[in-house]
Amino acid sequence: MSAFFDLLKSQTASHPPIWLLRQVGRYMPPYQELKGSQSLKTFFHNTEAIVEATLLGPSLLHVDAAILFADILSILDGFAVTYDFAPGPRIQFSPEQPFTFTSDPQTIFSYLLDAIRTLKQKLPVPLIVFAASPFTLACYLIDGGASKDFSKTMSFLYVYPEKFDQLISTIIEGTAIYLKTQMDAGAAAVQLFESSSLRLPSALFTRYVTEPNRRLIAKLKEQAIPVSLFCRCFEENFYTLQATQADTLHPDYHVDLHRIQKNLMLSLQGNLDPAIFLLPQEKLLHYVEAFLVPLRTYPNFIFNSGHGILPETPLENVQLVVSYVQRQL
């Protein structure tokens, strides 16, 4: 059984639950209107904006879950790390600087917690909150933002493995507090994002991805929190993620969900290539149907994308996919 799946399945009896990565974003005209000329950081710290943006998912798409409108860098407020968006993330961090998590998350994250309390009253569906998994957040910190190869992180990892392990441990402790605080405010489930894991050689995957996520999830399970783990990886590494004890595993589009579902009996979420949403609608539905056929009888399946919806995606295409899935299954 999967607590994450059961939570979402409670919303529908006729079809597998459906929600999407980055289901609220630049591809939505109402989102663009809501954001206006605000900077991203200002927008992410505006309680009213967080509420209104989060509500766009269920109101425009009729999905079975909402995900809090925030950023994976929002947690850095709790570590007193300076960051901004220009437009991509820029982080001011040195592995040599003191790095501890706040003892007062209620105050530091009041803008998020107030939004969650409001959303709990307004949403017709469960609210998912999220965080970067430990390795991914470490990559962003050491490289100072997003990177194609995370060369600074990999160099630091190889030269200073003990310091890197300590950084991972501190991230685990802080992330657990960050997410538990949001759950206490009224969120229903957690999604973890291991988005930088493709950078690791297979020989290091268990040490830096599987094991840190297992440790983090164990802390969340102290409060019986439903957890889904998204991970960018190839099939050979995906199987090791069973050891994390996540309720639901969510591979990106590199993994053949049709093949792995034959070898696993656990809750799976995913993993339609977001590029498919760009197709003309007739071709779009052809690919969605082909994706769904082998999964119709798979228990504990949650329909989702294999990465975030692309900014150039037509809103009506996303609405069509959600409607189609809910009618067909």
Curated annotation (Swiss-Prot):
Site (Transition state stabilizer) location in chain: 71
Subcellular localization(s) per the UniProt record: Cytoplasm
Pathway(s) where this gene product acts: Porphyrin-containing compound metabolism; protoporphyrin-IX biosynthesis; coproporphyrinogen-III from 5-aminolevulinate: step 4/4
The enzyme's E.C. designation: 4.1.1.37
InterPro entries: UROD/MetE-like_sf, Uroporphyrinogen_deCO2ase_HemE, Uroporphyrinogen_deCOase
CDD domains: URO-D (cd00717)
Keywords, alphabetical: Cytoplasm, Decarboxylase, Lyase, Porphyrin biosynthesis
Main location: cytoplasm
PROSITE patterns: UROD_1 (PS00906), UROD_2 (PS00907)
Gene3D superfamilies (UniProt xref): 3.20.20.210
GO molecular function: uroporphyrinogen decarboxylase activity
Amino-acid biosynthesis among keywords: no
Pfam families xrefs: URO-D
Positions with a binding annotation for substrate: 22-26, 71, 140, 195, 307
Keyword Lyase recorded: yes
Main function: Catalyzes the decarboxylation of four acetate groups of uroporphyrinogen-III to yield coproporphyrinogen-III.
Assigned protein family: Belongs to the uroporphyrinogen decarboxylase family.
Subunit structure: Homodimer.
Name of this protein: Uroporphyrinogen decarboxylase
Species whose genome carries this gene: Chlamydia pneumoniae (Chlamydophila pneumoniae)
Lineage: Bacteria, Pseudomonadati, Chlamydiota, Chlamydiia, Chlamydiales
Gene name of the encoded protein: hemE
